[in-house]
């Protein structure tokens, strides 16, 4: 459990967390993911790794596919209302990410459910009851809502319902601990209050740092196009990891590898104080990530490929060469189609 505690950005309340761990009972660890995009990024993978760690400690992972909440749109960190996604688009994304997630998590001690199974069936009276669990003043305690309200920026009532629905998910699955990115802390804490409202023992909120994207500034997101897909080729994953700013790689070491934090600190010290080339340390990071997602052999091959093509500027071994008849007018789309590149 030390691995998770060392990496968590918040554990709230800590005393209740410690009591749960001491109880030795099998805990229900909730993680909700909204299938709003077709891919699983390293950002998602970081928190999915944390969920798997709980499984390895003998606890039950409860993975909620937010097929209902994805229609509402998570307002966390947003300065304006999110565009609503069509149901069929959400279903398509869900079918795409589910097998990837299943490959990350252990098959034992795993429950995967969709929140549309209960949220879509709530009656009007039940929605009114849920809404009565929280006040407008509580909602405006959220920094993003508060900022938008102060600037007279529109906030739809639908957005207020998102954290209510997320909290109700905790009621539905009887969560003992809910984990998520640090931007979810307010939502997770509201989940505690909603569980209390329904006369349940409140969950503990446990958040982890948000992984920064390849641009080195914004959180990794498919909407920002600064992400690394875990289903990308080993060569591409390795190359993209090598492209991240040096100062960002420590977050990647912390959230995406099993290295001890003291060992990571030593790497950082060697660069800052002893003049060690950060390039060499980042190569290790790339190998560790690719090795976990694929294999040690694939990681070595990706490193060699990066060295040959990116550093030494050699021609790739799998480079395809096509002959074009110069007497004909060149029509690029046709050439690509004929050679199976489209």
Labelled PLM ranges:
Residues 1-11:
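N-terminal regions that are enriched for targeting/export leaders
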Residues 8, 86-208, 216:
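Divalent-metal (Mg2+/Mn2+/Ca2+)-assisted nucleotide/phosphate chemistry catalytic cores
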Residues 11-74, 179-185, 191:
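N-terminal catalytic cores of NTP/NDP-binding nucleotidyl/phosphoryl-transfer enzymes
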Residues 24-32, 61, 162-172, 278-281:
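Short, hydrophobic/aliphatic alpha-helical segments
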Residues 72-77, 123-125:
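Short, conserved acidic/polar surface loops in the N-terminal third of protein domains
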Residues 75-91:
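A charged helix-plus-loop insertion that forms the helical arch/lid used to bind
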Residues 78-83, 128-132, 224:
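Short, hinge-like loop/turn segments at secondary-structure boundaries
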Residues 194-342:
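Conserved nucleotide- and phosphate/pyrophosphate-binding catalytic cores
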């Amino acid at each position: 459990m030390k691995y998770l505690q060392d990496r968590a950005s918040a554990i709230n309340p800590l005393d209740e967390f410690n009591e749960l761990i001491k109880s030795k009972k099998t805990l229900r660890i909730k993680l909700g993911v909204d299938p709003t995009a077709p891919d699983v990024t390293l950002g998602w993978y970081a928190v999915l790794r944390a969920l798997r760690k709980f499984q390895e400690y003998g606890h039950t992972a409860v993975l909620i596919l937010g097929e209902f909440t994805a229609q509402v749109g998570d307002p966390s960190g947003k300065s304006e209302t999110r565009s609503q996604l069509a149901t069929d688009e959400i279903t398509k994304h869900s079918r795409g990410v589910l097998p990837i997630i299943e490959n990350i998590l252990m098959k034992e001690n795993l429950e995967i459910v969709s929140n549309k199974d209960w949220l879509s069936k709530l009656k009007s009276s039940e929605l009114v009851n849920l809404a009565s669990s929280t006040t407008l003043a509580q909602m405006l305690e959220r920094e993003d809502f508060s900022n938008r309200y102060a600037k007279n920026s529109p906030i739809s009532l639908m957005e207020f319902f998102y954290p209510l629905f997320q909290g109700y998910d905790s009621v539905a699955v009887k969560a003992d601990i809910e984990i998520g990115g640090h931007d979810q802390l307010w939502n997770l804490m509201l989940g505690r209050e909603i569980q209390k409202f329904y006369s349940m023992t409140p969950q503990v909120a446990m958040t982890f740092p948000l992984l920064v994207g390849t641009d080195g500034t914004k959180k990794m997101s498919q909407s920002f196009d600064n992400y690394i897909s875990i289903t990308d080729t080993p060569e591409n994953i390795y190359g993209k990891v090598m492209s991240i700013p040096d100062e960002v790689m420590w977050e990647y070491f912390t959230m995406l590898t099993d290295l001890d934090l003291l060992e990571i600190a030593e790497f950082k010290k060697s660069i800052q104080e002893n003049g060690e080339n950060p390039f060499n340390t980042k190569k290790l990071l790339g190998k560790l990530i690719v090795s976990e997602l694929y294999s040690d052999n694939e990681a070595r091959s990706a490193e060699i490929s990066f060295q040959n093509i990116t550093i030494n500027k050699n021609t790739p071994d799998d480079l395809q060469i096509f002959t074009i008849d110069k007497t004909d007018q060149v029509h690029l789309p046709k050439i690509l189609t004929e050679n199976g590149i489209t």
